Amino acid sequence: EEVSNGQEHTEGMXQGEXNXIXVEEHHEGEKNSHLVGKDEEKKLFVGALSEHFSKYGEIEGINIKVDPVTGRAGEHVINSKAYFGQFGNIVEVELFDKTKARGTRGGQR
């Protein structure tokens, strides 16, 4: 993995392959061309996904989380369709509503 602060990490895959993924973390106040006009505390961008996911075939679905307070997800749905559409046909997009999905998340508390 290549991290935006310049550090580079390589993680071996099960078949011995190495996969490079660029990760950028954007903090509030930073101005980037794709964040202009957005009031976001943090953004995470993971690139080089086409090489990684293309070996698995067509994308059948995308699960997008909706903020229960702001209800924001519309712009992310549009951007996700355009972005993931370049890797193949999108069969389904599902919005994740945190208020309806109250599970144990891997254990009891």
Curated annotation (Swiss-Prot):
Disulphide linkage map: none
GO MF term list: RNA binding
Location(s) in or outside the cell: Cytoplasm; Nucleus
Primary localisation category: cytoplasm
Residues modified to Asymmetric dimethylarginine: R102, R105
Superkingdom in the source lineage: Eukaryota
Gene Ontology annotations for the cellular component aspect, listed alphabetically: cytoplasm; nucleus; ribonucleoprotein complex
SUPFAM superfamilies, sorted: RNA-binding domain, RBD
Compositionally biased spans, kind Basic and acidic residues: 23-36
Domain RRM residues, every copy: 40-50
Segments for region (Disordered): 1-36
Keywords annotated in UniProt: Cytoplasm, Methylation, Nucleus, Ribonucleoprotein, RNA-binding
Name used for this protein in its record: Heterogeneous nuclear ribonucleoprotein-like protein HD40
Native organism: Artemia salina (Brine shrimp)
